[in-house]
Amino acid sequence: IEELNLLLIGIMIRRLKKDVLKDLPDKIRTTVPIELSNRAKYDRAKKDFLAYTLQEHGLKKAEKASNAEGVVKKGALRRLAIEGKMKGIIDWLKDFLEDNVDEKIILFTIHKQTIKDLMVHFSDVAVVIEGDTPAKERTKIVEKFQNNKKVKVFIGNMMSAGTGITLTASSTVCFLEIDYIPNEFLQAEDRAHRIGQKDSVNVYYFLGKDSIDEEIMIDILNPKMSVFNRVIDGKSESDTNIFETLMEGRDEKTK
């Protein structure tokens, strides 16, 4: 990694957004812990998976699974996590919209079912961009969110709406599901945190308590971000290593 960093230093110049766009407001990140409403179902699924891994691959593989490497490959646990979070998420969003009547909010998701569940409650005030949304429609949807005061909620699939659009009408970004690629979160955050934004941007990461969400954050996203920082900056400590900071903040809240 150190050799790669030295090589990159000789062929590239990295300019940080905070240095180039110094007038941008702050970005404030927070975790929102959510109790799983399907706790028993989730725990059974995880127990069954770990038992299967132990039987098939031995203790070491099972230990890795409990730390997310094996579990992550099982999308069923991720789907159970968001299924169990939905009630808490819906309640949180309704409270936000009631308490902030003049504000808009951006929601990023992964699964199609999550979007369907959200639209049951917010279809009258929401717009959606997902993978099969035509390019021409995307432009209209973004313009509607940016300019129509009646539209309060933007719901986007992170892969489809996390880059290439401007959503500065809102200063609140929410990640309802946790994926494995750290830079996808940073890119998606910046749909609101970009030129034209006048307010501090609040970013919320919704984590299912004692679930795969926390395991991905600790065991996958944090190490990946550290490796990225070492390759690009030559050090693992960086203000871009957001996931370690987020989890430290979560731990402080629970003390």
Model-assigned labels for residue ranges:
Residues 1-103, 203, 221-222:
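Inter-lobe coupling linker of SF2 helicases/translocases
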Residues 32-34, 129-131, 206:
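Hydrophobic residues at beta-strand termini and immediately following loops
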Residues 38-40, 113-114, 134, 160-162, ...:
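Conserved nucleotide-binding/hydrolysis micro-motifs of P-loop NTPases
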Residues 43, 87, 116, 120, ...:
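Alpha-helical elements of the RecA-like P-loop NTPase motor core of helicases
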Residues 105-106, 141-145, 172-174, 180, ...:
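A generic "structured core" feature
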Residues 106-108, 116, 123-161:
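Conserved helicase ATPase core of P-loop NTP-dependent helicases/translocases
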Residues 165-178, 201-205:
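A short beta-strand element within the Helicase C-terminal
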Residues 180-254:
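A conserved SF2-helicase RecA2
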